Amino acid sequence: MFDSLWTRINGVWKYILALFDVKLNTLVSAKLAESEDSKTIYQFLNESLRNQKKISIGTDLKHEYRDAIDKLKVKHHFCKFHVKQEINKRFKDYFDKNPLTEEEKDILSNLKEDIYKILDTNDLDSAKRYRNELIDKKYPKNRFTNKIIWKFIIPYFKKLTTHLENTNIPSTNNKIENIFQKVFPKHIKRTMKIEHGLRTRFMLKLNHWNIKNEKEKNHTSF
């Protein structure tokens, strides 16, 4: 999994780029960067993954992440939580900003249900079947439906369902977000004054996470 965490040092925004190994259950690479543009992310991932076995990288929906991972030629999957969050936002915004008839609302509600069938199924064959059914239903074409069906769900189907191909691939990025919250809760990441302090806190908290993680693994192995 890959993600970035913003923090501000003396009023200047910085980004912690981080790569999380699901199998090891910890961060395996982290870097403080000036930006999170696709070039910076590509360089970070390329260095971090050199000579490493790569299965798939999970991220949220930022385009900078997509561009960087596509350039790496590594399989890429989207976090299901962020996908649902984005879909909910798009539908809510469209409902709020447009005068819709009850019939139009029903049609859009059905569309959302059909999309969720794809996202919530537990096997790839069912996801493909629901995708084909979505196409066959021929929902009314307008800017909104075109964008959500033909520019998101259909072209990114593989990125939405990678976790169904391999059970070792998680469907969400919850683990990396959890470690971020443990290391840098909001009240801390807004108050860092110097880079050295940030790095020191990061390594101390990460070491604590790893020790706790190792204890839990040893405990569950008996």
PLM region descriptions:
Residues 1-58, 63, 175:
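RNase H-like nuclease fold core
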Residues 49-59, 63-194, 207-218:
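Extended amphipathic alpha-helical interaction segments
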Residues 193-198, 222:
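Non-catalytic terminal/accessory segments
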Residues 200-208:
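Amphipathic alpha-helical interaction/assembly segments
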